Design a protein with these regions (language model features):
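Two-component/phosphorelay signaling modules centered on CheY-like receiver
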Residues: 14-33
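Alpha4 helix (beta4-alpha4-beta5 surface) of REC/receiver domains from two-component response regulators
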Residues: 21-22, 66, 89-104
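Acidic, metal-coordinating helix/loop segments flanking the phosphotransfer/catalytic sites
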Residues: 34-52
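Acidic catalytic/metal-coordinating carboxylates
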Residues: 37-40, 63-69
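Active-site T/S-Asp motif of two-component receiver
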Residues: 54-56
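Receiver (REC) domain active-site loop signature in two-component systems and cognate sites
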Residues: 59
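A Lys-centered signature of the CheY-like receiver
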Residues: 70, 108
Length: 108
């Protein structure tokens, strides 16, 4: 796996973004950028420089599930790996994320 891949971390809670960033850094992934919701993430994604997306589900503006659907509907972004890191632990939500095309789902 390319340790220089550019990873976008999307979460409205800055402490959670920092925790994820630190965990990634500990694994050797230091090329990260941040956004506080789906709406602010889209321009970053559209820049074409992101290799991996980590997103929360519950955020103001555009939620993580809506961001995931946006990514999967976009011809240039649809193959982007997406990991959802969220407090949403209900079976229905995990199924919804899987059906929307998430690559991984971690309950925080």
């Amino acid at each position: 796996m390319d340790k220089n891949m550019k990873i976008l971390i999307v979460d409205d809670f800055s402490t959670m973004r920092r925790i994820i960033k630190n965990l990634l850094r500990d694994l050797g992934f230091t090329n990260t950028v941040e956004a506080d919701d789906g709406t602010t993430a889209i321009p970053v994604l559209n820049s074409g420089s992101i290799d991996f997306l980590v997103t929360d589900w519950n955020m103001p503006g555009m939620t993580g599930i809506d961001l995931l659907r946006h990514v999967r509907a976009d011809e240039k972004l649809k193959h982007l790996p997406v990991l959802m890191v969220t407090a949403e632990a209900k079976r229905e939500q995990i199924i919804e994320a899987a059906q929307a095309g998430v690559n991984g789902y971690v309950v925080k």
